[in-house]
A protein has these predicted regions:
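Short glycine/serine- and small hydrophobic-enriched flexible loop segments
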Residues: 99, 181-184, 215
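Soluble, non-transmembrane catalytic domains of enzymes that act on hydrophobic metabolites at membranes
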Residues: 193, 209-226
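Active-site-proximal alpha-helical scaffolds that flank and shape metal-associated catalytic sites
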Residues: 132-204, 228-239
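Short alpha-helical scaffolding segments that buttress acidic/His motifs in well-ordered protein cores
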Residues: 82-83, 116, 165, 196
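Terminal targeting/low-complexity segments that flank the catalytic cores of oxidoreductases
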Residues: 1-113, 136-147, 158, 162, ...
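Extended, well-ordered alpha-helical scaffold segments
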Residues: 112-119, 195, 199
Length: 299
């Protein structure tokens, strides 16, 4: 493990060597805001930005009777939600991680401090890029995700860094796998497909880093700390999956009367538990479910 006295990010030499490799890759190839997309070209809103089979209410009675134009509108709104989720998450990570470096500068190894800085820099570029895409596509940024935004801005800054890394990993991993699962088909609007693909190159490194830090935490932390984190996870993970699966706020954004009111808890629950969404979540979150179950985070 890290030889730093009283380290707050204990990690094995083998894993720390892998983190150094992540830094090297990031220094040589990372998202460039100016060139990642052909900004002089239009975004084609007549094409789907995601697989239409993955619409939140697809396979439920609430999707029946919707016109093709309404389904296309929903697809763009849902993509706007996905990007908004990234924006709210990724602009909270830099102050969180830089705060850890400032507070624990003598208890985090130089290699890990460097990657936390790189991670933060990349998230700022992602946020700028997502905001520019949203404006170009004529999409509005959705409200901050209820509960998760408070977790990131109020709760995690007061907890030890490894716990902050774990929960940012869980949120980012769910959002990333969800976006990639639906956006990479050949029929998807080209600018949207490219945006998510290019974003994924950086995010794959972020996810690897988060996994290594989190796994090290569960190998070295006290039983009391582990039990506390597991208790938090068992509350947060189901809420996170539900939030990604269907966000009731969509009823406030449609140009037509949406079949589910923003406060209709029974219908919202029905969509969350629909067989179609259960199958979809099992497919897109297979890797995440296997990892969190191995660590006992949702049992």
């Amino acid at each position: 493990m890290s030889t730093l006295n009283n380290s707050v990010l204990a990690i094995s030499p083998a894993r720390e060597s892998k983190v150094r490799k992540l830094s090297e890759v990031s220094h040589h190839k990372t998202m460039d805001h100016a060139t990642v997309l052909p900004w002089d070209q239009d975004i084609d809103r007549s094409l789907y930005p995601k697989d239409p089979e993955h619409l939140w209410i697809n396979g439920t009675r609430y999707c029946e009777g919707l016109s093709d134009a309404q389904k296309l509108e929903l697809a763009w709104l849902e993509t706007g939600r996905d990007i908004s989720m990234f924006i709210w998450l990724e602009q909270t990570i830099p102050p969180l991680y830089m705060g850890y470096i400032t507070q624990f500068h003598d208890r985090i190894s130089p290699d890990l401090q460097e990657y936390l800085m790189i991670f933060s820099k990349e998230e700022i570029v992602h946020t700028l890029t997502f905001k520019r895409f949203m404006a170009k596509a004529g999409l509005k940024i959705w409200n901050p995700p209820v509960g998760l935004y408070e977790l990131l801005t109020q709760t995690l800054p007061k907890m030890e860094p490894a716990v902050g890394v774990l929960f940012t990993l869980l949120i980012e991993w769910v959002a990333e796998m969800g976006a990639m699962h639906t956006s990479q088909g050949a029929a998807v609007e080209p600018m949207t497909r490219t945006l998510f693909r290019e974003h994924h190159y950086d995010e794959a490194r972020h996810i690897a880093f988060g996994r290594w830090i989190s796994e090290s935490f569960f190998e070295t932390a006290s039983r009391e700390s582990i039990d506390q984190v597991k208790a938090m996870s068992r509350k947060i993970i189901p809420a996170l999956i539900d939030m990604f699966t269907y966000n009731p706020e969509i009823a406030l954004h449609t140009s037509f009367e949406f079949p589910i009111a923003v406060d209709d808890k029974a219908k919202i629950e029905e969509v969350w538990r629909s067989p179609n969404n259960a199958r979809l979540n099992d497919a897109r979150f297979t890797e995440i479910y296997a990892w969190i179950d191995k660590l006992g985070l949702r049992q």
